[in-house]
């Protein structure tokens, strides 16, 4: 039930391990910090990370007449979260399902969750261009998707797979809002200088290739990693960091691109 949601944004990448879930959670927290009501939907069925990243593991979800009630991170209910992780008894339990069952669960997540009025719904997806992605795109076409943010790392091995994701978006008619380059450089936790331990500017070149906006470059910052397991925004904890600067810029870009 997405009729009360103003903006639906999908976070995608053709490559696993590039930090989609971290970007999704910190973007959601940054939007909340800016006064928006936000929903975060984790549809990575085989590797749900959002409950862990926000310290919500073990929380229960309930059903009402309107569908599943999401988990709220605060009493004012400004950030609502839904993930298959809430349905698993143990974090180590694997999800061993065939395609049709995965498709059914994703459709339930997109149509049977009771989202209240939201300014933004951020959807964290699994890597690749599989059945899950096709199901998401088909469902979102029915209710409306305002665009996709594509996350990549600067290495060529990641860029190759992300190019396929860009082609997938174009073939399925999903508007690409832009590309975020993650894990670009390492921030020293002592002096905060940034060293390019891998290649750099891969996201910039990819954005130029795809003719879409480059939304920012995020470094590897151990101080950000410490925030995993909490609902603390980088904007609150590390306001002077590069990560906070990029997220602030990203929020401002979304405000100009989409309905506020």
UniProtKB/Swiss-Prot annotation:
Keywords: 4Fe-4S, ATP-binding, Cytoplasm, Iron, Iron-sulfur, Metal-binding, Nucleotide-binding
Residues the entry annotates as binding [4Fe-4S] cluster: 188, 191
Cofactor: [4Fe-4S] cluster
Keyword Methyltransferase recorded: no
InterPro entries in alphabetical order: Mrp-like_CS, Mrp/NBP35_ATP-bd, NUBP2/Cfd1_eukaryotes, P-loop_NTPase, YlxH/NBP35
Subcellular location(s) of the protein: Cytoplasm
One annotated GO biological process: iron-sulfur cluster assembly
A GO term, aspect molecular function: ATP-dependent FeS chaperone activity
Keyword ATP-binding: yes
Assigned GO CC terms: cytosol
Note accompanying the cofactor annotation: Binds 4 [4Fe-4S] clusters per heterotetramer. Contains two stable clusters in the N-termini of Nubp1 and two labile, bridging clusters between subunits of the Nubp1-Nubp2 heterotetramer.
SUPFAM superfamilies: P-loop containing nucleoside triphosphate hydrolases
One Pfam family linked to the record: ParA
Highest taxon of the lineage: Eukaryota
Binding sites annotated in the UniProt record for ATP: 14-21
Membrane-spanning segments: none
Family the entry assigns: Belongs to the Mrp/NBP35 ATP-binding proteins family. NUBP2/CFD1 subfamily.
Subunit structure: Heterotetramer of 2 Nubp1 and 2 Nubp2 chains.
Entry function: Component of the cytosolic iron-sulfur (Fe/S) protein assembly (CIA) machinery. Required for maturation of extramitochondrial Fe-S proteins. The Nubp1-Nubp2 heterotetramer forms a Fe-S scaffold complex, mediating the de novo assembly of an Fe-S cluster and its transfer to target apoproteins.
Name this protein carries in UniProt: Cytosolic Fe-S cluster assembly factor Nubp2 homolog
Organism listed in the record: Drosophila sechellia (Fruit fly)
Originating gene: Nubp2
């Amino acid at each position: 039930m997405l009729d009360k949601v103003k903006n639906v944004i999908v976070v995608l990448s053709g490559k696993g391990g590039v930090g989609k879930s971290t970007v999704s959670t910190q973007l959601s927290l940054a939007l909340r910090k800016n006064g928006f009501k936000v929903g975060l939907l984790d549809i990575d069925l085989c590797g749900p990370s959002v409950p862990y990243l926000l310290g919500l593991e073990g929380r229960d979800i309930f059903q009402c007449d309107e569908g599943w009630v999401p988990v709220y991170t605060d009493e004012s209910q400004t950030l609502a979260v839904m993930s298959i992780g809430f349905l698993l008894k143990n974090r180590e339990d694997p999800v061993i399902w065939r395609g049709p069952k995965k498709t059914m669960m994703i459709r339930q997540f997109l149509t049977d969750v009771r989202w209240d009025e939201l300014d933004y719904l951020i959807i964290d997806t699994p890597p690749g261009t599989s059945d899950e992605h096709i199901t998401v795109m088909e469902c979102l076409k029915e209710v409306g998707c305002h665009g996709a943010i594509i996350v990549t790392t600067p290495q060529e091995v990641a860029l190759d797979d992300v190019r396929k994701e860009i082609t997938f978006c174009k073939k399925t008619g999903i508007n690409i809002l832009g590309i975020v380059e993650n894990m670009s450089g390492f921030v020293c936790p002592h002096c905060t200088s940034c060293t390019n331990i891998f290649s750099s500017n891969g996201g910039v070149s990819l954005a130029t290739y795809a003719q879409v906006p480059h939304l920012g470059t995020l470094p590897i910052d151990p101080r950000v990693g410490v925030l995993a397991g909490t609902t603390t925004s980088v904007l609150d904890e590390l306001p002077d960091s590069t990560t906070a600067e990029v997220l602030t810029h990203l929020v401002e870009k979304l405000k100009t691109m989409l309905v506020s």
